Amino acid sequence: MCGFSRRFDKSYRDAYNKMQAGAIGSPSVLRSQTCDKLDPSGFFVAYAEFSGGIFVDCSIHDIDLTLWFFGASSKVKSVSAVGITAVEPDLRKHKDRDNAVGLVEFYDGRIAYFYASRMMAAGQEDTTEIIGTKGKVTVNTQPAMNHVNLFDDTGVRREIPQTYYDRFEYAFVTEANEFTASVLDGTPLPLDLTAAVQAVRIGAALQESMVSGKKICFDEQGNRTEVARL
């Protein structure tokens, strides 16, 4: 089983169930982001040597959400991406960026837009919008650690999760429990590895497009018809 933690998050599961029930009509556009808090220690530069890049490390979760909400059989028509190094120029040594935007077009006419960042000031900001023909459903568009608001002489404010693990703590617990149940009780695994492999392929193509500056196209069998090179 591949640990895409957001599939085990209570809010994302609720959003998925609402979409499946027809609450937003036909899902047509997905806009999602994975944005980490700035770490001035240089950790992300060292990590980039092994991570596969910001799309493979961060946006992979948004890509997996897309395949979940749009359906694992969705066929990619093209990917394109751009990125900048706003705070960590040394990331370019590893062909990586600290802010990046990616666009994925599917053969069925749907599109997905991804934003990834390593420089959030307040904390972890992972949000998603699924826009349909009759409405939209959003997840975490106003991040909050809990239900506490602080009122003082500066105004009203609330804290938000500081790390990815703070945000998805209970999703990791649910994931471990469901995997254990699959092993011990024979319950079905909650996700298909074929979709996980497809998510990695899309992430790698976005990373390549970002570095090369070229759009990458695919035929309906998944073969590349226009090749960008790092």
Model regions and ranges:
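Predominantly a Rossmann-like dinucleotide-binding segment in NAD(P)-dependent oxidoreductases
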Residues: 1, 6-94, 213
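Glycine- and charged-residue-rich phosphate/anionic-cofactor binding loop of Rossmann-like
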Residues: 2, 159-164, 182-199
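Hydrophobic side-chain positions on well-ordered alpha-helices
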Residues: 18, 181-182, 209
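Short, hydrophobic secondary-structure boundary micro-motifs
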Residues: 27, 79, 160, 190-192, ...
